[in-house]
């Protein structure tokens, strides 16, 4: 195991490893224990009581964080004609069709989200081996296969994020930056948790959210009480 820095060890010493913190308390502590000098990302990880190998236990969806993530997403749109012009006007970073498909097929994935008009999905679908593992494949269930490219781009730029449980039954979310007020981080956390709870598969038995952890990019993990769904501001 790699040796932890003195800053990390000092930060970890402020956390009670046996305690489950309320969301507001957890994000406040994450801000206070950030060992980095830069404006680090604040993330949350949920361990779910599902078996992602089974189709009826897959958890996938989107959530609009009320305060965004602090990161402006680079959005790619597969579109032509008027739809391409609309995507450009909405602020998409990359817009095209065959040219982008060829570039991605060669291994380029320097973007954070992809949107496609329905008529191009026959071609875009061939990129599954490249985009699928990176959770970048446009999907009608997440609103990224749509004729309304303007709304899709605006939603993503405004803080909408896609999520999908990984093979280890974990979900990961960026909920903001250390520079965010704690209340905004807590409200983003609550929005993510609410959507995860809403999407609980009926086939999932037993405890659904088994663990919730908040941490900054290089900071120690802070256990959050998954039973607390409201934003409580007392610490």
UniProtKB/Swiss-Prot annotation:
GO terms for molecular function: rRNA binding; structural constituent of ribosome; tRNA binding. PROSITE patterns: RIBOSOMAL_L1 (PS01199). Pfam families: Ribosomal_L1. Keywords: Repressor, Ribonucleoprotein, Ribosomal protein, RNA-binding, rRNA-binding, Translation regulation, tRNA-binding. Gene3D superfamilies: 3.30.190.20, 3.40.50.790. GO terms for biological process: regulation of translation; translation. CDD domains: Ribosomal_L1 (cd00403). It comes from the Bacteria. One of its GO terms (cellular component) is large ribosomal subunit. Part of the 50S ribosomal subunit. Belongs to the universal ribosomal protein uL1 family. Binds directly to 23S rRNA. The L1 stalk is quite mobile in the ribosome, and is involved in E site tRNA release. NCBIfam families: rplA_bact (TIGR01169). This is Large ribosomal subunit protein uL1.
